[in-house]
Amino acid sequence: MSVADIRKGAEQKMQRSIDAFKNDLSKIRTGRAHTGLLDHIQCDYYGSPVPISQVANLTLIDARTIGVQPWEKKMVQVVEKAIRESDLGLNPATQGDVIRVPMPALTEERRRELTKVVKSEAETAKVAVRNLRRDANEQLKKLVKDKEISEDDERRAGDDVQKLTDKFVAEIDKLVVTKEAEIMTV
């Protein structure tokens, strides 16, 4: 394994950590509606659990309302029940074959709780990135021990890995600031 392989592997894994963090952030409800909010909700479809997006059309009706239109009429009640029983605290209302999902306004206390959740998720993502840095540095030390690279090369590669770590941690911080602003906006 070469220094370039170690660096590239670390960068790819760090990017995956960022992607997972973005995915976690998208599940945190803000006062604004977005269809991604319902992505992880499963409903029963002929005996097997499937995401709502696979049995219905999801659209934004306005800034605070999501429209869910199941493709099969008999799925309307099933989808509505799945949304109501989710952990998002939503109260869907059916109008014909369209389910309207209004986003309730967040209380100040709930907004503060959500910002704490965001910070906690961010810290978890940062720890994952730092663990990947540690793994890459251990691989570099092994190359030095096996006399495949010099200590100077290890130091340079270690600096590169540190720069990657700093870049991804800064990206996490930027995502946190954006999400907190989104949550705190009334």
UniProtKB/Swiss-Prot annotation:
Keywords: Cytoplasm, Protein biosynthesis. InterPro entries: Ribosome_recyc_fac (IPR002661), Ribosome_recyc_fac_dom (IPR023584), RRF_sf (IPR036191). Pfam families: RRF. One of its GO terms (molecular function) is ribosomal large subunit binding. GO terms for biological process: cytoplasmic translational termination. One of its GO terms (cellular component) is cytosol. Disulfide bonds: none annotated. It comes from the Bacteria. The keyword Zinc does not apply. The keyword Protein biosynthesis applies. It is found in: Cytoplasm. CDD domains: RRF (cd00520). Belongs to the RRF family. PANTHER family: MITOCHONDRIAL RIBOSOME RECYCLING FACTOR PSEUDO 1, RIBOSOME RECYCLING FACTOR. Responsible for the release of ribosomes from messenger RNA at the termination of protein biosynthesis. May increase the efficiency of translation by recycling ribosomes from one round of translation to another. This is Ribosome-recycling factor. The lineage of its organism: Bacteria, Pseudomonadati, Pseudomonadota, Betaproteobacteria, Burkholderiales. The gene is frr.
